[in-house]
Amino acid sequence: MTRPMRCFALLAAFLLAPLAQAAIPAAPERNEGEGPWPQLILRGATVITGTGSPAFGPVDIVIEGDRITRVQIVGSANAPIDPENRPALKQGGREIDLSGHYVMPGIVDMHGHIGGDEQGVTAEYVYKLWLAHGITSVRDPGCGNGIEWCASEAKRSAANTITAPRLFPYAFFGMGQDDPITTPEQARQWVRSMKAKGALGMKCFGYRPDILEAAFDELRKQGMGSACHHAQLDVARVNVLTTARWGLTTMEHWYGLPEALFDGQTVQQYPADYNYMDEQHRFGEAGKLWAQASEKGSERYEAVITELLELGFTLDPTFTIYQATRDLMRARTAEWHADYTHPALWDFFTPSRHNHGSFFFDWGSEQETDWKHNYQRWMAFVNDYKNRGGRVTVGSDSGYIYKTYGFGTIEELELLREAGFHPLEVMRAATLSGAEALGAEDRIGSIEVGKLADLVVLSENPLANLKVLYGTGHIRLGENGEPTRVGGVRYTIKDGIVYDAPALLRDVRAIVAEEKAKRGTEELPQP
């Protein structure tokens, strides 16, 4: 997915000097969360480290300030715990009994747009949905609210003066320029200027090859990261293999990968009447793209996947954002929309020729069938890449195509499971792999001594059922024969600050209800 439609108009002119959309109000000062404390001990939990190791417990996790200082096994499973084997609580400390609970690292969402004027939602709404789903770190690819705004929010989050995940601002290539970038030196100057303004990396859709190569080279020199959505307007010149060679950190979605796998053709098989600015046409034809790529075992496939692995390249597939293309009714009627999808966001989702990602003008079984086959090939490549040692991360791109913030991220975990990932591999993709791709694995991504206390606490086992991470929980038939809801995140801990996840969800429901009351409606309208 992409940022504003204005960016695409400029892409069509091969200029790519995007105009920033109007920035939304910054988040209010923090009133939520308790801590950090001189010492906080989480008692008796089962731990999922995020490294790929199996769960173990009971464990006491000791946090001092914002850091994990001890991860101590305090007994055997299903056996009494000897108090003498437990870390002592210091004066002024706090302890939380988490017997029967699970603790995992905070989720790293590698593709999280904070939203903007187009979506009509506030930063508070987005941040609280993220934190309520255990998302403690988010890369904003593009900084659609402006680099100054995004960098400011990142600083405020780092200081914990707002209720928000930690933020990693990646500026959109060319943003802030009055005119298009036309030389490699201008690209280098732009990279340096963005770093000075607080950007940690760059997001691009493509560009003239010599200019884009210079930008990637300068990013490397400046120690910055990069993300690329290889849009169709430039992918014939620069596909994922080219940008990976230039030093691209992560590819977003799937664009550029099938094109790198072409054998016997050099461009997508576009029909003669194809128009990129007709989004149903664009995404309809995209559903036929993986069928044009070389298959596993072919010489071309093996050459491409081998080189990407050798380059240490990262895939950020964002399966979730295209899920509606294979099952529109399911996406449109997801149970969380009623309470958690803001009416203004719903307006943006409604089919429209003007709102990006709202391209379901006449989307039927033929398009969905193409995309179901597309997903099979796409998922097979991603799983194969992981199995051969490649890094795969979790990104949601919510705020488009019926994807609500927070919920879309958990859907991505389920889709990685569908692709063939073991639940522990899903957890690693959602935590440590994202931290590694951001160059932040020394601080976040796993439950280890010395790392920041970014943790998620659940009353249910997410390895047995990823659905317990949804804010709406999971329906289970109780012992009394009545269906009941279980799960949902209990606490999200960021920098040692403990957030009550259900309370954050109540705040979001209140925001949504208030907007509905203003409109005089109780339900989101369906077409």
State what each model feature region is:
Residues L452-R509:
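C-terminal cap of metal-dependent C-N hydrolases
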Residues V126-I147, A164-G174, K195-Y207, F216, ...:
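Divalent metal-dependent hydrolysis catalytic cores, especially in the metallo-beta-lactamase
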Residues F8-L19:
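Bacterial N-terminal signal peptides
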Residues A45, F360-D370, Y375, A380, ...:
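C-terminal helical cap
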Residues F172-Q222, T249-T250, N275-E295:
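Active-site gating/metal-coordination segments in enzymes
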Residues N85-T161, D179-E185, V238-A244:
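Metal-associated gating/positioning segment near the N- to mid-region
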Residues W190-L200, L257-A419, V512-K516, G520-P527:
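Active-site neighborhoods of metal-dependent hydrolases
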Residues I24-P38, V47, T51-M104:
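Histidine-rich, glycine-flanked metal-binding segment
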